[in-house]
């Protein structure tokens, strides 16, 4: 027995005979409407329109018309009063009327006006509605360094801001509370310099305390007792900070700085000594020491300056001659004086320095009666100097025009370097220029050059 019922709660029944069912052995039954609904095909759900457009031969998807506008595709010949097929013309040249020849109306400003494309040009503001018109133009400074004068205490332009006080009040908000931190103090290292070798008596009225080894002030008061020599008495009123005094040993060459006579100093000399830097004795110390002993006082400073000396030049023999000292007679603008021996001398006065023209390999050298100076490099001199002309400042050798000149002849002579003499002040009688020294009746020096067997013409402008 076969049952087609899907419900197990019902009984089973046999099927009738299947004969006469047109050979279809399947049982078709309409389902209930509460479970299944009818399918409704809406427009576009199956893309029938898109498929029809795609399968067609037109180009309507590209906005291209299959037939021209105003043309009836159903007839082969079209008769009308406008367009290209009638007696009227839409685009007639030089036709600015608003009506065509057929009597139909047209726009005054046509797109194809006169055969050219002239579309109407309208501003965007005119195309916007009233609620979307543009607002008024505004400007904003985007500079980073823009200054708002109204927010400053002292503006740059005060007359524009009368409500701002020009002199602001500067008040101090600092607190008056102070904090003092007391830290333990240590015994100074140079305490032995402050110990009094003589003992003393401390009265009971004085509030003094003795420093112990730990450096505290916890000792009781001393009453009517004699303090020993090695005990240090410190007052509580003494400052707790001590400056370290640096002492230096006595220099080893102290005998060079002390005279033969004993130097008496007072007992009030300070306990601190500055370090004295000493230098070796120069070999020409006899030229700088006076024959008389040096007298110093007890108030002399303890610091000495270093005196830098220079060695004697190696070519000194080129400038020394003890036989023939040159004599230069200049009687104009001169001054007579006497030296220690009573010998009369004539000292010329020249406002400008002497210049040597035509002399090569000359090194500037300044030699006076008491001192001589030289540079760092050795002096290069020549044994023979050619015929040269010495001009005073402003002469022909310097490119100027002298007022008048006097020629002086100097016979064959040599240079003489005088021996050291006691220091004298010749600032009024001696002529010293850069690289040139002239002395009459004693020496004749031209920039350190040696004059041998030559005649020198001297032009001195007065």
From Swiss-Prot:
Superkingdom per UniProt: Viruses
Family per record: Belongs to the IIV-6 329R family.
Name this polypeptide is given: Uncharacterized protein 099R
